[in-house]
């Protein structure tokens, strides 16, 4: 609508008319803020958008290209929701099977197997190894579940008591030390940095001006300290790619992208292209995980059911063979 010549207020007003009742209240509050002279990024607080989406809109507001910013943030939000739906859809059936399998294990281990064990003892039948293992596991399961829940509660408490209160730089440092989360953290920070800086540079700002805006924004607090530190380093004569190369929280390819962009004069274009590439790579990996996770879960469930079946039936076959 902005590309068709509508003013921002008119576009939001038009969308509010056709929005669901729950969204209309938020959009009307947003309209009141716009009418009162608040900037867009402040008025958007009523919509409770994700921080990365708000950051993109803030950048587009500062460089004067709101239409492109809304399109880019909309695409990002749409991809996020699509991946979320695919993940939920792929995990719904396996989770149901896991719950059913756990119930089956509970019934067999605590109601059926004890009676069979008493019967086989009275008949002086030696139980197979697999049945003994299942019985031993059933005796340890309550302790394992208790330990699991205690650890889960401790992790939640640790997050809210300590990690949640850490400054942004320390949070990133902790995440980089956790296996499995380190690479994901680098990808998220790199992608947001490229989208933010690339969008600002595309609007005609210099690198120093773009970093100054990063230092002022309130949506991604980590970039506030990053912007301030990088500005000091650039004032001391360093190049941007040298600043990035020393930082462990960016992908190792980013300094080369920045160095090449500075040489060719296409830094904004290269940063935006690199961010799009990283988003596509992340989406491709998620799809790959979704394809792989279902067979793995089904195989594990099948193996558990097979073990329970053998634990129940082998003593029966052994008893029949002894007759």
UniProtKB/Swiss-Prot annotation:
Q: Which UniProt keywords apply?
A: Cell membrane, Competence, Membrane, Transmembrane, Transmembrane helix, Transport
Q: Which biological process annotations from GO are given for this protein?
A: establishment of competence for transformation; protein secretion
Q: Which domain of life is it from?
A: Bacteria
Q: How does it sit in the membrane?
A: Multi-pass membrane protein
Q: Which Gene3D superfamilies match?
A: Type II secretion system (T2SS), domain F
Q: Which GO terms describe its cellular component?
A: plasma membrane
Q: Where are the transmembrane segments?
A: 93-113, 141-161, 188-208, 296-316
Q: What is its main location?
A: membrane
Q: Does the keyword DNA repair apply?
A: no
Record bears the keyword Translocase: no
Give the family per the record: Belongs to the GSP F family.
Role, per record: Required for transformation and DNA binding.
Name recorded for this polypeptide: ComG operon protein 2 homolog
Organism in which the protein naturally occurs: Halalkalibacterium halodurans (strain ATCC BAA-125 / DSM 18197 / FERM 7344 / JCM 9153 / C-125) (Bacillus halodurans)
Q: What is the lineage of its organism?
A: Bacteria, Bacillati, Bacillota, Bacilli, Bacillales
């Amino acid at each position: 609508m902005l590309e068709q010549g509508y003013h921002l207020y008119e576009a939001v007003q038009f969308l509010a008319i056709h929005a669901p009742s729950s969204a209309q209240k938020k959009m009307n509050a947003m309209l009141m803020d716009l009418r009162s002279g608040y900037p867009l990024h402040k008025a958007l607080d009523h919509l409770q958008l994700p921080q990365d989406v708000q950051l993109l809109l803030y950048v587009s507001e500062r460089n004067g290209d709101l239409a492109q910013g809304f399109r880019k943030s909309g695409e990002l939000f749409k991809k996020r929701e699509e991946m979320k739906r695919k993940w939920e859809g792929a995990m719904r059936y396996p989770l149901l099977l896991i719950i059913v399998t756990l119930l089956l294990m509970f019934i067999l281990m605590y109601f059926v197997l004890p009676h069979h064990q008493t019967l086989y003892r009275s008949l002086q039948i030696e139980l197979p190894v697999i049945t003994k293992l299942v019985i031993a596991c059933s005796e340890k399961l309550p302790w394992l579940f208790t330990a699991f829940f205690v650890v889960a509660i401790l992790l939640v408490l640790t997050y809210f008591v300590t990690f949640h209160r850490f400054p942004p730089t320390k949070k990133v440092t902790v995440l980089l030390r956790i296996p499995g989360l380190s690479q994901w953290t680098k990808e998220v920070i790199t992608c947001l940095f490229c989208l933010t800086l690339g969008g600002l540079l595309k609007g005609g700002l210099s690198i120093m001006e773009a970093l100054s805006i990063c230092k002022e924004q309130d949506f991604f607090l980590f970039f506030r300290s990053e912007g301030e530190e990088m500005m000091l380093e650039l004032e001391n004569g360093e190049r941007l790619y040298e600043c990035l190369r020393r930082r462990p929280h960016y992908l190792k390819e980013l300094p080369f992208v920045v160095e090449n962009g500075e040489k060719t004069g296409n830094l904004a274009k290269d940063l935006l292209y690199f961010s799009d590439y990283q988003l596509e790579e992340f989406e491709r990996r998620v799809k790959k995980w979704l394809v792989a996770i279902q067979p793995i879960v089904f195989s594990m469930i099948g193996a558990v059911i097979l073990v329970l079946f053998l634990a129940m039936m082998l003593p029966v076959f052994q008893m029949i063979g002894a007759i």
